[in-house]
Amino acid sequence: IATSHYYERIRTDATASTRQQAQEGNYWDSFLNLNFDYDKRNQKYQTSEGFRSRYFIDLPLISDTNTLGNTYNFNYFAELYDNNRSNFSIYLKSVDSISNNDVKLSERVFLPSSKLRGFESGRVGPKDGNDFIGGNYASAINFSSTIPQLFENSENIDFLFFVDAANIWGVDYDSSIDDKSTIRSSLGLGIDWLTPI
């Protein structure tokens, strides 16, 4: 359990839509943060077995928009063959105003780059004109699996194969905007480098 407090000033330029410009101003928000973490991994780093389930709730205490945030993360780890580490994960996030106000531009949902690799961060989902504005909801499913080491004495470097699928949708402040509810996906090869820092 924790609290968080934010003061922010939202500014827009002449290219912003009328509804975006209407959100200009100064805001003070205070939230009660509830975090639930059930961790059954065999180890925190280079995990090869177990799972971790996390749920985060941000409850508005003092807020102009009274935005309620929910985030859920689930990771399952397994060893598919000797010296392999595989990870399957689910990510869900939502933001909604409990007083039927528009969710602020700064509180809207964007996908973390780790949830949809190969796409430019912040440039997926609903658009208002030329601006990517994020959504009210996001979901992602990810799978990654290490492949046999290509070089000897490279214990700190993992080569892996990954598949990502994700979506962002929902625009509460203007129902005329196409929320671009389309699943994006990617697959590829990556490097996971473990350093002491």
Language-model-detected regions and their locations in the chain:
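C-terminal outer-membrane beta-barrel translocator/porin domains of Gram-negative envelope proteins
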Residues: 11-156, 161, 169-171
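Short basic (Lys/Arg) and small-residue
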Residues: 164
